[in-house]
Amino acid sequence: MIAFGAPRRRSFGLLFSLAPHLFFLFLIGTLANKLNVPQVLLPFSREPGRVPFLLEAQRGCYIWHSTHHDAVTIQPLYENGTSCSQRAVLVAESTQPIRLSSIILAREVVTDHELRCDVKVDVIDNIEIVSRTRELYVDDAPLELMVRALDSKGNTFSTLAGMVFEWSIAQDNESSREELSSKIRILKYSEAEYSPPDYIIEMEKQERQGDVILVSGMRTGAAVVKVRIYEPFYKKVAAALIRLLVLENIFLIPSHDTYLLVGAYIKYRVAKMVQGRMTEVNFPLEHYTLELQDHRLTNGGLPSKSVALLDEKTAMVTAVQLGQTNLVFVHKNVHMRSVSGLPNSTIYVVEPGFLGFSIHPGGRWSLEVGQVYVITVEVFDKSSTRVYISDNLKITFQFSKEYFEEQLSTSNGSYHVVKALKDGVVVINATLTSSLQERNSSQPKTYQISHQQEVKIYFPIQLKPSFLAFPHHPLGISNRFTVQVEGGSGNFTWSSSNETVAMVTTKGVVTAGQVRGNSTILARDVQNPSRSGDIKVYVMKLNKMELLPFQADVEIGQIIEVPIAMYHVNTETKEAIAFTDCSHLPLDLNSDKQGVFTLFKEGIQKPGAMHCSSVHIAATSPGHTLVTVSVTGHEEHAWSSATFAAYEPLKALNPVDVALVTWQSVKEMVFEGGPHPWILEPSRFFLELSMEKAEAIRVAEVRLPAKRKQNQYVYRVLCLELGEQVLTFRIGNHPGVLNPSPSVEKVQVRFICAHPASMLVTPMYKAPSGTQPCPLPQYNKQLIPVSSLRDSVLELAVFDQHGRKFDNFSSLMLEWKSSNETLAHFEDSKSVEMVARDDGSGQTRLHGHQILKVHQMKGTVLIGVNFAGYSGKKSPKGISNSPRSAGVELILVEDVTVQPENATIYNHPDVKEIFNLVEGSGYFLINSSEQDIVTITYREAESSVQLVPAHPGFLTLEVYDLCLAYLGPAVAQIRVSDIQELELDLIDKVEIGKTVLVVVRVLGSSKHPFRNKYFRNMEVRLQLASAIVTLRLMEDQDEYSENYMLRAVTVGQTTLVAIATDRMGKKFTSAPRHIEVFPPFRLIPEKMTLIATNMMQIMSEGGPQPQSIIHFSISNQTVAVVNRRGQVTGKSVGTAVLHGTIQTVNEDTGKVIVFSQDEVQIEVVQLQAVRILAAATRLVTATEMPVYVMGVTSTQTPFSFSNASPLLTFHWSMSKRDVLDLVPRHSEVFLQLPAENNFAMVVHTKAAGRTTIKVTVRSENSSSGQLEGNLLELSDEIQILVFEKLQLFYANCQPEQILMPMNSQLKLHTNREGAAFVSSRVLKCFPNSSVIEEDGGGLLRSGSIAGTAVLEVTSIEPFGVNQTTITGVQVAPVTYLRLSSYPKLYTAQGRTLSAFPLGMSLTFIVEFYNNIGEKFHTHNTRLYMALNRDDLLLIGPGNRNYTYMAQAVNKGVTVVGLWDQRHPGMADYIPVAVEHAIEPDTKLIFVGDVICFSTQLVNQHGEPGVWMISTNNIVQTDTATGVGVARNPGTATIFHNIPGVVKTFREVVVNASSRLTLSYDLKTYLTNTPNATAFKLFISTGRNVNLKGSCTPSQALAIEKVLLPETLMLCHVQFSNTLLDIPASKVFHIHSEFSVEKGVYVCLIKVRQESKELRQVLSVADTSVYGWATLVSERGKNGMQRILIPFIPGFYMNQSEFVLGHKDTGELRILGVERVLESLEVFHSSPFLAVSGYKHSMLTTGLTVYLVRIVNFTAFQQMSSPAFINVSCALTNQQEAVIVRAKDASGADHCEDSGVFKNFVGSYQILLFTLFAVLASTSFIFLAHNAFLNKVQTIPVVYVPTTGTTQPGSYTATCSPPHFLSSRPPLVQSRLQHWLWSIKH
């Protein structure tokens, strides 16, 4: 909860720190929720009904609380019976008449937000009456008066609800004394139609008055209403008074302000409201008078005159002069004259300004011919205010008699009724010509004001057609029809009376057809909406359609419009109504023959004058068909059909126009097309051929064979006489009933018979269609080429004297000859083959063909043809003029070819490509497959084709030989292309100083390259971004590219692009090729020495950056092997060469390109000996020096043997431990490295003395070949001398000396800089003072000379004191260096680290020492660092000089070597081991595993760090303790962070649980015995246990309280016996837990409280229990494993008491399964009882009976304590007891009878079961079924009755019937029977 006084900043901080899902609730609570009032003031009262107040919140549910219950109580109000309260009632409970206060707090139950209300209780000091008005009207609505109470400070009380007041009418001192109740009356709310508050209704029922009342006016006058508080306590509070005036509700007509002209008058009327109706009042008035007051004159008026005069008798006001005055009501009663509510009116006397017109109806000046209109002329003053027009005003109104007829007009001319006569535009005029006689004036006042108005008159609006009828379509297809409008202005608004039936657009387009019905479409004139026209629209059902008469046959290509009429037929009157438009209905056009007619233009349908739709069908093929037109998708199938025929156009095929034949030759004339015989009347078909001269020709009709066309008509015409005539062919059908207007067609041709005049022989050219013929015959050349490879056909044509070619000359005799038979000859020179051919004129003629045989030889031959005469017996006249011979000279040539056949041409106007044509006739047709791509110029003289490109594209150049036999054109494939792409091909990584080839290609479309001869047109050039490389054009060039030589000059990167410009000036740039010039690629080290099994990684420098993958190979893999990372492992002694290449694969060629390569010499040796490398053997005390193991040679460094497999171990020892300490590396950070990593140590000198250091190197296996001679160990030792450092003074004041290496510098600083003037100088007194230089400012520089100098530093203080200090500076060479690590690592007590934690950040610091171990203060050494592998550490220079930063990224040992580049012998080697610092191992983690993470890392104070997890939904982790639960499969990373020291991590891979493993203690089993111990079912989700790692108590607590891993597991049980109709969940309660002790999940199965019936059923149930579990996150994913749990039900007894007599025997019946019954123990507690052995029931399975009797009845009766029979079972741990009591003596006789009855009952029982057996034998089917069920279901049918005594469970031997006679069957039996007979219901 937020405190009320909290600062705003804190509130906002809390607001934004809320969880997102609470933010909305917080906003509601703080910004939206509030109480209806913040403060409440309640009146003090001693009456029983205290004053309540309703406090209400806006939203939410609240708990209300009052801080001062004695003063204020609060009662919540609940909504609709719920526990949610938004309102509460405040009641003042104060009993003291003093001011008390309380705070009401309302707390919201969800957000806990509190609302506050301050409540005060005080005494009423005074009261007053509040009213919205002080004036009432007679018979008007009543007025509400309210009491407002104030305290002594003037504060208003919040409510007075419930307080009793006395209202009364008091005497008005100002008015005359009358009866008090005559003016006003106090009303109850029940008497008025008002809705008062509920408390007022209750008070009025009790005849009390509250703080609110109603008063009503009775008659005019004044009245006083008084109120006081009824409660006696407030009798001293003064009453409140209010004075009310009651007025009459009168009106002045007109009530608005009036404007008059001078001399005009107006007569007023007065009306009043009586009982809701307005009634006019006659003058004079009873209570009022009218007066003109406040006369205000305008400038220039006469003050002696009034503005207007009033006639009081008639209420007429006459305007006198300009100005204004008020007409007011004055009350005759003097006391009422102060009333302000009486009506009044202001009268303005003005001058006229202008006139205006108004017209009715419509109010628009757009009129209609024949209509009557009212035109009103209005007068306005200069302020545009309308002036009242009196009768004495004169207005002249003028209009055209041609356009208007005046029907009525007023005397003053302001009102006219006219009728419009004709259409047109006319102007009306009005003029104010008033002559008003002013009073006391002799001159009349005249006005001349005019106005005119333009009027447009139109004809009445008429819509065409008179009505519209549309068919209704059930699919909602709408009809659209444009209504035509006549009359009106032409601009209309359209509307529909029923838009569901018909809608209309703004253009008058009616849409209807979706809904049946009718509607009226109305068109209103926009200029005058009162003018309109309408049309009725009907949407009706379509019943009938028909096709109207039309022409039935038509020529192909022509169109027939088929008109369609559709109707709605009234079912009663049979009247047919034709639809106006049905063109939008979808029509289905079906033909019995497809393809004869088709729908034209996708079915154009349009209505006409006699039809509502039409179908246009086009004749497409000859034939006839029955066309059926129907409406698709309609409710009733409407259709109509008709037959149509189509025929081809009639034409003369041969001849087309003229036929020319020789004498006695025949012309076959062919006509085609024309009408077919009409299918319905074929007998009326006719055809005829008529001629002019029948004797000159003989005509015979040729009957065509079946294979010829049916519509062709052939006639053979034989020439009998020379001459010319016209033949006419007609075809068609005669008119008939079924075809009244059939089509008839005719065509005419000319027939000529003549002598031949000339002949022509030409080779026959089979030119392709569409090409021109051979031009040789036109040129009349002497030599005509023909093919020397193929036989040629020579054609003979014959012409008459007019040059016309003959159609047939077969009657002539001819002879053929060849001049050179070796070149060509004729096989039959006498005959000629007549071939019919169309020679291009469209007419077929017969030509003479002769085959010329060739012998594939070139040459020239002359061919001749001789004419011998006619083949007839006699010849006609004039034959002597005929030709005798014709000849032609031929040249034999080969076919033409095009060179080149393929080419890609650059699209540039300067490009001209030449294609040569070789051989052929020389007469060619050049064709292109595409136009406008190139400009083709055929150069006939050169026999070539020139192509100039115009547009890009692909084309085929076809060359046709026009004068050779056609086999096909010679072709060339040509591609014209713009520049599409520039391609640069080069190796983009070049080693400095090397050269590579650069190939430039320009590609066109489809990646085809251009020839380089076009490059000059393209302006191809190369451009470099920088000059780190050079380019040189090569002399040797490829045809399709330009080649350059690129030479690398400087290391760096640049970009090379190729640039070209096309014909439009657009630049094309190739993809930039980034060229990297890299330094020479080098592998490090140049030579590598390894022992067998040792691994070291090859490093590299130089080469392309970022470096590509280096491909390693080794020359001898028996010596060493290398992997892809460059890690070399020694195999056996020997040498090998390792090659490393940087290469890539060219994407275009697929070739491997090698950028650079280098090699390393590999030597694998055996360690012959080891030696300890110590840089110095004489050291001062208190210094450190690294020592490490080396081989015999300097190349056998720790890199050579520190990473062998198996590892070598290094054991160090000393002869004297008090002289120095020998510690492993990284001991400064508390790391304890194992012996395998101790190849390097650190010597810490302690005291002066001499000691020996020894190292022993051991190999675990002599067969590994690591040591020479298969030795197992090698050793070495050295001596170290430690001496005391020279000291001049005692140790507490030892002066310091500056130690500098040679060629270094050091900047000195003092503590007085800035405060004093500090200077320094090198003293010259020392002989070697030249070893350093000093600039005077504290900068020391050492040279290349070793020695010692003295430095003097002087400080001149501002206060007059000089300080001087002298120190020594020694310059010496660096002897050795040492690597130390940082930061320090701390572990828990008793724990050590053997490696750096994974993920840790390390800092390595390099320190330098001289030959005796003194540390240098400055450095100038150039260091080189090397690693034996780079995959475990990320290492690099630190942020300070001579420091290195490293990150441990992988497990393993890395050997770090550091040495001086100028002095490689000065080196140090350290092992850096990295291991996991977080336990346990997380390799095999499954969903559900609980992991207790731990680490031995702590901070310097021994405190652990903080745990973090990368993904909490995979491994839910408690960050405080470091325990996690694997909830989902995936990968997560666990972090342990010790701030400022170390941050380590471990990756956790969570696998999906393959299967849940279930188990339980085999010694346990399930039972349903009450209070039985819980059964435990153990579940494991992984392979073993689910608990990983060892858990601390805090982690175990977090598992139990925070992580709750058991929520992952769901446990289930089920009885194995499926026939047992009891769910296991009714018997057992099951839930899951996680056991930290066992590390597995546990399902706890406990027994629920069971009913007796359930225990009874289960007691004999032979069943087990299936148990299984599922993971919540992986439900249904894996196979479910179930385990069978043994179940032993508890036995059941229905008896708790025996009442036995002297000779009675009780039967103790126990139900249970067999093994339970066998383990029962039954014993009695009294010696007077006897329990006989049990016996099994033969009829009922699972029932055992024990007999109980009393041995000594008398002694048993005298027992003071009750006797028991105890029944127990060891299997189920169940114990039951039955009380045995003795029967009293009073029931002896009855008991004897009962004993007899008992015997009878026993016999009856036997009879009952005997009867049951008999019935069973008669009902074999039932018993068989029942036996089958009993066999399957092991639950027995047991009748265990309940006793009939008053004590349930007791057994009375004499007074109870036997148990097996109980009338109520048990639950299982009834359930079994119901199940048995209700199998399928």
Swiss-Prot record:
GO terms for cellular component: membrane. Residues 1-32 form the signal peptide. It is a single-pass membrane protein. One of its GO terms (biological process) is Sertoli cell development. Pfam families: Big_2 (PF02368), Ig_NUP210_15th (PF22959), Ig_NUP210_16th (PF25354), Ig_NUP210_1st (PF22967), Ig_NUP210_2nd (PF22969), Ig_NUP210_3rd (PF22963), Ig_NUP210_4th (PF24991), Ig_NUP210_6th (PF24935). Disruption phenotype: Knockout animals do not show any overt phenotype. Males and females are fertile, with no age-dependent decrease in fertility. In males, spermatozoa have a uniform moderately abnormal head morphology, frequent flagellar anomalies and decreased progressive motility. They do not show compromised histone removal or nuclear compaction failure. The chain crosses the membrane at residues 1804-1824. InterPro entries: Big_2 (IPR003343), Ig_NUP210_4th (IPR056897), Ig_NUP210_6th (IPR056898), Ig_NUP210_9th (IPR056899), Invasin/intimin_cell_adhesion (IPR008964), NUP210-like (IPR045197), NUP210_Ig1 (IPR055096), NUP210_Ig15 (IPR055094). Keywords: Glycoprotein, Membrane, Nucleus, Signal, Transmembrane, Transmembrane helix. Its main location: nucleus. Expressed in testis. It is found in: Nucleus membrane; Nucleus, Nucleoplasm. Residues 1078-1150 form the BIG2 domain. Glycans are attached at residues 80, 344, 808, 1441. Belongs to the NUP210 family. This is Nuclear pore membrane glycoprotein 210-like. It comes from Mus musculus. The lineage of its organism: Eukaryota, Metazoa, Chordata, Craniata, Vertebrata. The gene is Nup210l.
